[in-house]
Amino acid sequence: NIRKSIVLGYGWNNIEVAKISNNYNLKKSKLFPERIIPFCSINPNWGNKAMQELERCLREGARGIGELHPTNQFLDLKNKKILEPMMTLARSEKIPVTIHGSEPVGHKYPGKGKSSPKELFDFIELFPDNIIILAHWGGGLLFYELMKEVKKISENVFYDTATTSFLYEPKIFKIANELVGSKKIIFGTDYPLVSSQRILNEMKELTQEDIKNITYKNVTSIFNS
């Protein structure tokens, strides 16, 4: 059973729509504080308005930023000037930033985007001290952690498992555990697109300790950092 969930917003382009989404998540988290942890959805391209919205969300209980969707939000992950205010605040508040990852190969699907492992790595290089969660296994960036320089720069990077069922064979859990370890993997679903039980079923070959790390220990550690 899922006792508590992190609820993310979408990568919105319209700030008024983002506010509606953020308000909904914040409201529900106050009604069900033992069940919901809200994140705040912004677009750094909004400049000061983005920062004002982020600061408001943090005051009202948001515990992270995301999901950012670089393709849909026309966000250049190498534009440090645009990204730095958000990342500086996130770093000072010790909150994670969640970014959509896109596989550079394979089938197309709605929302896939073009935030490839290369773009995500460039972003991480700019902000290595930030806590960063790469959605959908970072589009495969975790496989490059076999390279020493990628592993070193990705010390504060986590990979979430959202939509695993649509992207990879279940054995990715075992392979990812061997590559980066269960302490760098965070349980995600993209619910209701994929159910939590379906993802959990695909983790059955892992040890109970690894499953505990992925499902709750890692995020607990992030929030207590």
Regions found by a protein language model. Give the residues of each.
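Short, surface-exposed alpha-helical segments at coil->helix boundaries
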Residues: 19-23, 117, 144, 197
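N-terminal cationic-hydrophobic initiation segments that often serve targeting/anchoring roles
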Residues: 29-33, 58, 124-125, 150-151, ...
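Structured beta->alpha junctions
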Residues: 42, 46, 165, 191-192
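Catalytic pocket-lining loop regions of alpha/beta-barrel enzymes
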Residues: 63-64, 69, 77-186
